[in-house]
């Protein structure tokens, strides 16, 4: 009889004749997008195939359902799973905690139904990815799940991975806020880790950036964790985070949280293997319809330039970011709504972000214009967040990399895409910056700028115009309101 057994909490093994393993392997393997451009493929060092199961039948535990389904489709339904090896089979359900939860002012928070649903799903399945949009309250979902695990007495060491130092601080602060009335001060059970900080503690919960711990050589460090959470899970297919999760060989509880997953087989297969199947608890549109998030209005603005011969993407971007008329137009958008705050997102720090910041600072001496990029320290970024939260007429000029995720500013009304992007994750996470409810706003606005260099004779679309059309398609699929405008920039 065929059997599926556990190697550890990261990997499982299909015990079967080589012929059957090869069948499964051939069905599950696939070529990722753009494989032909990979240097290893070009050099003949890689066949261009992603192989979720190896020649010995070993696969990531999160792919258990996929392997079982493939076996059954091939007619091998007579297989056995050692249920003692897989936590979802042998461990009884854990009940959600009934702790009293509060906000910063000590007011009682009643979790939304979708938050409780997410926690219950995580506690029942013990592996998987919770998909909830920005503003859905993922930190509360993590908090409730962790408290439930600790109360069960079955989990002694819990690791929470976040992508940035700012998120380490923010999540710790959120945990402390939620415990305002229940006596569970974060400092008494949460250990924060960042570069240069002590990696070990007697406390049960560690919050860390993956950058701070991925190069730890001592295997026992990762073996101490019996539960792992991965915030902003869409970043977890990087080799460093994969290495961490593979090393957590005793972490039988694994939950990821994200607002969006890439529509890419390589990405989804990797994350499913590391963490498990995904569960979408709600959508941005549903939360707006329920009044939990602010309604969104999108102004899609196409700037019609003189025809430009086809150039490489980098050269096209160089033209766009150095276009003085375009940058002045971006500045003019910040004059549309008095006493509101603006977030201007850019891609290139030296070529675009800093020149925009300098221009805005000179043009609007009575406004607070604040620059954010990777050079700005975490504590300064946190201070910028607080300034924006407490004031009006603030303009944040920030790089996508620093402000697309994990920044919580309720008093933010407008977002401007000063640089184009085609990344679905980047687009939706950036939009989410402005959707949190605040007494000063009834609507959040996105100004999505794009550039058309095709003219009348050119047959092919320029790169950033094609990316703009992809974004419009994304907005339409989400049923967002879009106002389309064309402006002559010739």
Placement of each model-derived feature along the sequence:
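Conserved Walker A/P-loop ATP-binding site and its immediately adjacent core
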Residues: 139-144, 148-149, 154-177, 348-350
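Conserved helicase ATPase core of P-loop NTP-dependent helicases/translocases
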Residues: 189-201, 355, 367-403
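Conserved interdomain linker/interface between the two RecA-like ATPase lobes of SF2 helicase motors
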Residues: 282-342
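Conserved helix-turn-beta segment of the N-terminal RecA-like "Helicase ATP-binding" lobe
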Residues: 166-192, 363
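Post-DEXD/H (motif II) to motif III coupling segment of the RecA-like Helicase ATP-binding lobe
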Residues: 234-297
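Conserved segment of the helicase C-terminal RecA-like domain
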Residues: 434-469
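Conserved strand-helix element at the start of the C-terminal RecA-like helicase core
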Residues: 157-168, 319-328, 332-359, 475
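Walker A/P-loop
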Residues: 125-147
